[in-house]
Every structure is written in structure tokens, then in C-alpha cells.
């Protein structure tokens, strides 16, 4: 483990701590990628603070650097200033210049480098973030209980609820119920309910069911189609509101839920009615974190790999 590159150049590290995995990228001040590390999820609200910190450190150390000249840790679940303060205190000092950020801001920063813009994340959770060049504004970012409109968790949860209603006779059974049973290794309603309330319950486990719902929707399942339509429309509505607030006609999207052809089409069509274009971000959130860290120490880094 080392600090600083072998050529004496400063090392800048950006860490993207999401609900599924944690990715760390290390660059030298010349813009060369010199290390990359991957670890488990690090949203403290989903996995707990201790596990989140453990995965952040693992990702950092896996880059080959124990410390760096500047570090930005961009985390999912940073819903309040209290969350950020909590994680700043919990994460060991990885640099004399360490910043803890919301992952959505880092993702937007990767695209705009501080210019105004709007970004939507739809992964395990969801957020619509707007930045006007001075202040940040957000919608939906209040966690799995109070927010996460249009997220993988919300889609998976609705799929699970619909499957329960089908299995207890409240709704006509469709292929969605069969897919949910298979995905949760459940033989019947009792087993499915037990799975949902098990001590091993994790938000990302529910979110993973969104792919099952999307599969059923792609095959024409009416209940699944309704879930996907309502989820995508809900997030698109928030994106349109934020775009008007910030004064932009482009929305960047990030997150695995947008891999759904149906979800993406509904989202894009909704915004097109307001003449707002949708651009799928191809830049890693961890890269945005690198840029935030670099700019924080006055280094205008130009990464040679985006």
C-alpha cells in the first residue's frame, strides 16, 4: 500500500459507494488511471455503517493505495447533512483532503464538471438531482421508506405485493406471480411471505426483483406493465419538474433500471412532451468523485479514461 505515485505525482481517488457495489478509481495528477478497486455495497442505510465503511476501505485498498492526496467518497443514501456528518466521522482518514458527497452529485459532476444540470438515478434507490451552478436541489431522495420513486426497490416491492395478492386470491394470477416465486425460491404464499419478512431482508434483494417484473412486462403481463409504467412515469414527472426549476432541457440518467427498454421508453416519451431530451450517462460515478476530489484541491485533472 502506498500514497503517491511511483513517479512522485499526486494521487486522486474517487469512490462510488452504491447499493450494489463500491467502486474506487485512482488517478495520478497527469490524468492516468493507476488503480481500480471493487467491493460490496456501502449504502449505510441498507448494510449498516460498519459494513459500509468496511467496503469503502476494501475498494480503496484494492486500488493499491492506502491513502491519497485527495479523496472523494460519493455514497448512496446521503439524504441529510446528518448522514454526511455520520459517514465523515465513521470513515478513517484516507487523505488530508477527504470529501464525503452524495453519489448523485458525483454522477452529475462527471458530466457537467460543475455546470448546471439535472440527473436522475434509478438503481436500487432513486433520486432526481438538480444543480444550478451554485445550489443543489433534489426530489425523491428520501430512502426506501419515504422516497425512491421509480427505483428498483419500488418496482420490486410492487411486484412482490402483486404476487401476494395473486396467490391469496385478491387478483387473478398471472405469470408475474410465477416469476416472483421462482426468483425468491418460494413454493407457495407462506414461503413468499416468510422470504419477505426474513431477518436476511435487504433492500437490494427486493430491488433485484425489478428485473423479474420487467421480464414479465416485456412478455405482456398486464400487472407488470402497470408497475413499470407507473414507476417510470413517476420518476419522469419529477425529472420534468426539476428541469423547469434549473432551466435546462436535458436530463442525464444513471442506474440499472434504465437498462429496461420499456422503462426507458416510457421515461423518454414523457419528457419529450416537454421538449426535454434524455441522455444516458456513460461516465462512471467514481470518475465524477475523482473530479470532485481534484477540484477541491485546485487540480484541473483531465482523466485519460472516462
Where are these regions (language model features)?
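ATP-binding/phosphotransfer module of carbohydrate and carboxylate kinases, centering on a glycine-rich
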Residues: 1-68, 90, 111-116, 160-306
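Short acidic capping loops at alpha-helix termini that bridge into adjacent secondary structure
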Residues: 67-69, 96-97
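Glycine-rich beta-strand-to-loop/alpha-helix junction loops that act as flexible
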Residues: 72-78, 122-125, 248-259
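Flexible, active-site-adjacent loop/turn segments at secondary-structure boundaries
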Residues: 76, 143-144, 195, 255
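Phosphate-binding/catalytic loop of phosphoryl-transfer enzymes
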Residues: 78-173
